[in-house]
């Protein structure tokens, strides 16, 4: 929904603040000065990151100078989205925008000493969370371009750890997670990655252990300029 401020036919009425030419056109009742208080430190405002998924929202963000955040899709599906943003931003700014610029990717992450331990400690919790998310979305966002899933009685019958893990999870050993992140860097020229380990139901100590392993064993081995990396917290 979109709103107009002030509303049509607005008339300023305030006992403690009478109409003034300083902020109001007293003939038309048009407010000339209206702003957010307190104002942002950065001018005109901090960089804005818009959550996007469909082509229309991706293009709109690029055309209006907004950065974007993406989450669930597979690498192949993300490639198309990254290209849509790059092409729209290049046209809007009249320059060759490199793939990956202005995009941040969110990935669910859980690092453990073994692949089996990662699944045991966090697998059930990420699936339960995804059942809640996908109750509304279905599984379409998890599919590769052109992929067709077999028909099932219920729309989430295929949703299990094996289905999810290969598509978009950074779950496993430090070495596995490093390789998956480097794949994102190689295929998408990924420049911004956000990770999340605190899924509903997960043990707090396990979550903190995952984050520590990510900071200590994953970040130092990612093929990124270390000056651009902030540790997970």
Kindly label every feature range from the protein language model.
Residues 72-75, 196-207:
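Glycine-rich, proline-tolerant flexible connector loops at the mouths of alpha/beta enzymes
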Residues 40-47:
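A local structural motif
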Residues 1-39, 76-190, 223-233:
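An alpha-helical appendage that flanks or caps ligand/catalytic pockets
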Residues 212-224:
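Alpha-helix-loop-beta-strand connector modules within alpha/beta enzyme cores
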Residues 111-115, 203-213:
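Short glycine/threonine-rich loop-to-helix capping motif typified by GTGT followed
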Residues 48-51, 66-70, 101-108, 193-195:
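Hydrophobic faces of well-ordered beta-strands that scaffold small-molecule active sites
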Residues 53-76, 81-82:
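A conserved active-site cap/scaffold subdomain adjacent to cofactor or substrate pockets
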């Amino acid at each position: 929904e979109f709103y107009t401020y002030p509303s049509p036919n607005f008339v300023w009425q305030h006992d403690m603040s009478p109409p003034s030419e300083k902020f109001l056109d007293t003939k038309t009742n048009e407010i000339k000065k209206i702003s957010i208080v307190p104002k942002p430190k950065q001018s005109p405002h901090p960089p804005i990151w818009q959550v996007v998924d469909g082509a229309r929202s991706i293009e709109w963000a690029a055309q209006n100078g907004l950065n974007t955040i993406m989450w669930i899709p597979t690498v192949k599906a993300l490639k198309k989205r990254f290209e849509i943003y790059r092409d729209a931003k290049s046209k809007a700014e009249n320059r060759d925008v490199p793939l990956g610029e202005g995009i941040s990717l969110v990935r669910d992450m859980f690092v453990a000493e073994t692949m089996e331990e990662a699944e045991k400690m966090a697998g059930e919790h990420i699936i339960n969370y995804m059942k809640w998310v996908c109750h509304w979305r279905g599984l379409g966002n998890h599919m590769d371009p052109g992929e067709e899933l077999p028909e099932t009685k219920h729309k989430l019958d295929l949703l299990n750890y094996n289905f999810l893990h290969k598509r978009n999870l950074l779950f496993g050993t430090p070495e596995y997670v490093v390789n998956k992140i480097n794949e994102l860097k190689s295929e998408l020229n990924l420049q911004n990655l956000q990770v999340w380990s605190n899924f509903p139901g997960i043990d707090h100590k396990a979550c903190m252990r995952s984050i520590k392993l990510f900071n200590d064993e994953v970040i130092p081995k990612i093929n990124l300029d270390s000056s651009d990396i902030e540790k997970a917290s």
